[in-house]
């Protein structure tokens, strides 16, 4: 049972916004994705770290979720900052049931088991040091901290594997508020 994580897929199978237009490493990215995802088995778990589709709603994202549904095994989904399709977990699960999509689960204020570990996480938010108290970004950031703490609490005493869309450490910057909420552990095979 392997554990995989991938984010920022920005699928556009149902919209006209392919990432190939950015050139470079993005050229042929769907073929690269298919090749990379082909090693996943039905026994594995894949964490989808947000920004899954460019679609603005679930119906428009049907082709993208069909692609994700075809990935074998369990898929655990976090929200990204470009996941405009995201409404509620209830609506997502109804959509999946209607379309026959299986083994896709939302990680939001909850936790999932993976072997002897608990999978926790949330979108997070990029912390801006110069954001004014009470600003839009400040409110989102504080809400994401609450979601992260809720997810960690839902895990109980199990060792935690924590995933975020926004990294708490990035190019020399560390987000102390998020780093205080959890600890990093190293998994050795």
Label each region the model flagged.
Residues 66-72, 155, 179-187:
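Short, conserved loop/helix-junction motifs that constitute active-site signature segments
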Residues 1-70, 84, 143-158:
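N-terminal active-site segment of His-dependent metallophosphoesterases
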Residues 76, 168-189:
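Conserved beta-sheet core of the metallophosphoesterase superfamily
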């Amino acid at each position: 049972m392997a554990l995989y994580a991938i984010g920022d897929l920005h699928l556009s199978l149902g919209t006209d916004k392919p990432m190939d237009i950015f050139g470079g490493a993005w050229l042929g990215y769907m073929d690269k994705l298919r090749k990379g995802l082909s090693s996943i088995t039905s026994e594995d778990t894949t964490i989808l770290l947000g920004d899954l589709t460019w679609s603005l709603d679930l119906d428009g994202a049907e082709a993208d979720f069909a692609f994700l549904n075809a990935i074998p095994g369990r898929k655990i989904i976090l929200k990204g900052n470009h996941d405009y399709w995201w409404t509620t977990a209830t609506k997502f699960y109804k959509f999946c049931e209607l379309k026959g999509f299986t083994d896709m689960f939302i990680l939001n204020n909850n936790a999932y088991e993976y072997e002897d570990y608990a999978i926790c996480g949330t979108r997070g938010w990029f912390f801006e040091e110069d954001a004014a108290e009470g600003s839009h970004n400040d409110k989102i950031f504080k809400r994401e901290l609450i979601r992260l703490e809720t997810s960690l609490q839902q895990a109980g005493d199990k060792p935690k594997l924590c995933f975020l869309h926004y990294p708490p450490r990035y190019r020399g910057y560390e987000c102390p508020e998020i780093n205080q909420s959890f600890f990093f552990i190293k998994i050795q095979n």
